[in-house]
């Protein structure tokens, strides 16, 4: 069995006890370190540090303490070793530095299966494509065209592995060759979700792609983990593209997170009569996303400097930034 450092074992335990993306975890680790953060959970009588809001700190500890179990870290370590997953930590080898932009909401660690070079590439070499699970034929078609052409540039296609737009993006990227796509999972890597896409995930790894997750092995997805994953999808890439999304699609949250991080956001327009494109139209209407219809426009969106009209667009964006920020907050609710 592989030997994991005490630091790594504590991170494994904390990821199992706390929900991903909770800023209280990040604030505590930054203020008092990993060991003392775990001690706060184990000792309900210990004082909450001044680095966090007292009420939030108490709620955080209560939720984490309720998840404690015997040999929890050992179980996670054993599954990590059994499946030969890579365990990555901030600042360590293979860590995607783009995630550091998340600050206190950055993951404590990641599990990875596949080609690690896709993680060490710059954010500008990756494009997140996500959208409707119940995709229409139109949505699948434009997704396939975008993903194939972007992968050929080349750009690494990042998505969440869901049905519909996500799966279409992964499959299209695979047609261009190896090392073309990355799956960001909301469940442990040994618990593929959705299960019917397990074969797709295996194919991605075989073709030098990669799967990653901040959820420990042995644990399934949850609503909170799907929501938290949105920030990873947004932060990993230089741009987020929504080919098709309804007004209530979870992919709008990815777009909002990307906008908040200062990443480029694009959306593909659809038929005005189609409810399946209402979310894309909202993103464009509220100034969160630029209109994109082809890979070249996505590349321009990520690096506008070579194009003569870019400065004018940037001035307009700066003038409209306050309204855009409010729109992003509404999408995140």
Task: Describe these PLM feature segments.
Residues 1-94:
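Short, small/acidic-rich helices and loops at N termini and domain boundaries
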